[in-house]
């Protein structure tokens, strides 16, 4: 029997207070473990204790189901000796942790219901529930289908790392729902779907040989086929749009499925993920110089683990404890051997690359330069930078931080408009049928 989400969240808080961060890490849904090491949890908690003093009381948790897939977000108000905050724990339908945040005290109550962005017109399209793929690892999704009639251009959305739902819910934001409704309002059919690590996290966790290809390719290929076979869709204009790790993997998807007409790469990384994680932890630590020293042991441990992945001695037998975040070697062997920019260059398909200027997770200097080096001289490749946007393509000012994601906002209308214009006008060479 699955434990109630509120009980799970309170247990996690108890573990944090007792310093049992390795046990919390074991509760993470795979491959979320590839994003947040136990040392990072410990450093974040230690920083709050240094800043606010010991915990003096724990309030009543508030649970919020977030829609299809069974994800529940639990918010626990916590009072410290010198302040308050909210511990936000996301629990999947089968009991895994999909995320932990130390949020401001104002986040103790759930946000209001998601509201459509101004650029979405629900009267111009219909949302339809679909199943993507077949067999035990099929995943539920939503097809946003314009009412204007076909043949329509269409796009399948690939979300980033971790157990993402079809809306790519991050904090109080739903960037994929924004994007889907915005594109459908402009005449593009959009298919978004729960990741296999979200819909079937417990089954995936049993597979030690699980790779990045397993994480994306089966459902992405099925989504492309679903769109190509839909009577309202132009089979010669079915695209893939990937965000974050989904953008990194999009060229591999297109290589595996030649019917893909082109790619939209949204903040896709070209720096290896295990080194990007080190950079991100260092950046987050720099936002608060008073507690930056607490992150140094985490950064040193992550650096050692990243070097192990790069080592020629890495093999399937390498102990999990020596690898980033305890994720088994097959995942890293697959990811290490993949060069996304080279894969994109080999495709010979039109590509739109969009990047936020304030993004600290995927950056101009560390990642966009990789795409530019391989693709900038290609006439069928368009690269656009939105200076004010963060990793979710939400505009803002000043240094970006994880706290931004707790503020309900919408994807930049300029990004949605540019993607829609590109999808509806780009020249493709894939036969319609």
Question: What name fits each language-model region?
Answer:
Residues 7, 22-69:
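Short solvent-exposed beta->alpha transition segments
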Residues 108-150:
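N-terminal cap/lid segment of alpha/beta-hydrolase-fold proteins
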Residues 157-215, 394-405:
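Cap/lid segment of the alpha/beta-hydrolase catalytic domain
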Residues 209-230:
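Alpha/beta-hydrolase active-site loop
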Residues 262-346:
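Accessory cap/linker subdomain of secreted extracellular hydrolases
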Residues 347, 353-355:
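Short beta-strand/loop motif that positions the catalytic acidic residue
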Residues 360-366:
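Conserved alpha/beta-hydrolase "acid-adjacent" motif
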Residues 389-392, 397-433:
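Catalytic active-site module of serine/aspartate enzymes centered on a nucleophile-bearing elbow/loop
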């Amino acid at each position: 029997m699955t434990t109630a989400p509120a009980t799970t969240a309170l247990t996690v808080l108890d573990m944090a207070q007792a310093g049992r961060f390795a046990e919390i890490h074991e509760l993470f849904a795979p491959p979320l473990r590839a994003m947040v090491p136990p040392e990072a949890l410990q450093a974040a908690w230690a920083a709050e204790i240094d800043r606010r003093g010991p915990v003096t009381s724990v309030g009543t948790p508030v649970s919020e189901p977030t829609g299809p897939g069974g994800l529940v977000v639990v918010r626990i108000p916590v009072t410290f000796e010198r302040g308050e905050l909210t511990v936000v724990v996301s629990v999947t339908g089968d009991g895994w942790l999909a995320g932990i945040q130390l949020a401001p005290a104002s986040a103790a109550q759930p946000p209001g219901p998601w509201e459509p962005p101004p650029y979405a017109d629900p009267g111009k399209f219909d949302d339809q529930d679909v199943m993507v793929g077949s067999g035990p690892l099929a995943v539920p999704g939503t097809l946003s289908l314009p009412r204007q009639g076909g043949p329509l251009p269409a796009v399948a959305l690939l979300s980033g790392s971790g157990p993402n739902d079809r809306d790519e819910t991050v904090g109080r934001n739903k960037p994929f729902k924004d994007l889907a409704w915005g594109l459908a309002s402009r005449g593009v059919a959009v298919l978004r779907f729960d990741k296999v690590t979200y819909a079937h996290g417990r089954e995936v966790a049993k597979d030690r040989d699980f790779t990045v290809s397993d994480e994306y390719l089966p459902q992405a290929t099925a989504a492309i086929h679903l769109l190509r076979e839909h009577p309202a869709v132009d089979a010669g204009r079915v695209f893939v749009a990937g965000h974050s790790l989904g953008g990194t993997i999009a060229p591999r998807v297109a290589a595996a499925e030649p019917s893909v007409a082109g790619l939209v790469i949204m903040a896709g990384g070209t720096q290896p993920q295990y080194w990007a994680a080190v950079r991100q932890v260092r950046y987050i630590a720099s936002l608060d110089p008073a507690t930056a020293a607490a992150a140094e042991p985490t950064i040193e441990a992550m650096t050692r683990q990243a070097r192990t992945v790069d080592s020629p001695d890495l093999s399937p037998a390498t102990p999990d404890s020596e690898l980033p975040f305890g994720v088994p070697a097959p995942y890293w062997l697959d990811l290490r051997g993949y060069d996304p920019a080279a894969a994109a260059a080999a495709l010979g398909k039109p590509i739109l690359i969009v990047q936020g200027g304030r993004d600290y997770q995927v950056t101009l200097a560390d990642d966009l330069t990789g795409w530019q080096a391989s693709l900038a001289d290609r006439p069928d490749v368009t690269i656009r930078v939105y200076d004010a946007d963060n990793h979710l393509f939400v505009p803002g000012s000043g240094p970006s931080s994880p706290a931004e994601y707790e503020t309900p906002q919408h994807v930049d209308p300029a990004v949605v408009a540019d993607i829609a214009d590109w999808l509806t006008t780009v020249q493709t060479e894939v036969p319609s049928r």
